[in-house]
Amino acid sequence: MKAIVLREPGAPLVLEEIPDPQPGPGEAVAKVLACGAGLTVHHARAGRLNVATPRVLGHEITGEIVATGPDVTGLRRGDGVTAYFYMTCGECRWCRIDRETLCENFRGYVGREIDGGYAEYIKLPASSFIKLPDGLDWRKHPAEAGVICDAIATPVKVTRKARIAPTDTVAVFGAGGGLGVHMLQVARWVHARKVIAVDLAAAKFEACVKAGADITIDASEGRVGEQLLEATGGKGIDVAVDFVSAPSTAEAALAALGKGGRYVTLGGHGGTFTAYPGEMLRRELELLGSRYATKEEVVESLELVARGELWPMVTEKVPLEQAEALHQRLDKALVTGRAALMVT
């Protein structure tokens, strides 16, 4: 089969012919229709994440089951599927209370520890596949169906983690990126009172407004905290969702939080930032980390799209062979929303 392979961290992605995968016990193989080019893939390619190379990256798949191994139940040929890319045990105390991202027996990630979806076929543990719901036309919209499992499920979890309510003003840092634009969408879906997009790339603001932003703030001006306070009449924001998590964004967000404000970080590669306990006490601030989503939240996100309540923003779709060129555009922050590789 054709596959895009990362030979070593930081190296260009290359198109290769590799053997078709064969399912073993408890495994299934899916034909890949499309795979999103998400932030995790971007960091892995750049060498910012540990990846056992050579490796086929990618996890935001739309696929069709073509083979199952012994002992597999619940999947059959022809099923439309996506992937839950955290490989969890399903048995520890965290998995049993539907907090799989904290699994005590975590086995790694699809597209990092095992080969992912930048290929014509993907083999996974059967438990890592999630069936696509009726009402979601995954054959017609494979790119959009594939990115739901991360680009929408991750923001859905944030709304719960941060307890976003209709009275809240929400600011999204890195709002023009693949997770950011969908966070704007989901914040609007939960009826946040005001949604503010913060990004360095003003060219992305039109898409941010389309996704649900009421206000846009150009972070390149270097006065984000001040602008957020101005936008809220000095009261401050209720929730800051930070997909950048650099010291500058974290500190600007904390400075702009109002009473009872919640800061949520999802940027795993940010630096050390300063938070003042006295201010946290005075304003009763909360610092929160939110990591991916649970399987239940992925299923819910798929259903939301199937019902037409949300729709993924995939702005670039390119053939598998153009993976490296696409990631070069991602390197330069030239992609708004999500991009996807079209495989078959």
Feature annotation, model-predicted:
Residues 2, 14-17, 31, 62-64, ...:
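Residues located in well-ordered beta-strands
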Residues 21-36, 45-96, 114, 135-137:
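Glycine-rich beta-strand-centered segment in the early N-terminal region that forms part
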Residues 38, 85-130, 138:
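Cysteine-cluster motifs in flexible loop/terminal segments that predominantly coordinate metals
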Residues 127, 136-222, 226:
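Mid-domain Rossmann-like dinucleotide-binding core that forms the NAD(H)/NADP(H) cofactor-binding site
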Residues 162-163, 206-286:
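Glycine-rich cofactor phosphate-binding loops and adjacent beta1-alpha1 units
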Residues 251, 295-344:
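C-terminal hydrophobic helical "lid"/dimerization subdomain
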Residues 262-264, 275-314:
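Rossmann-fold dehydrogenase core element
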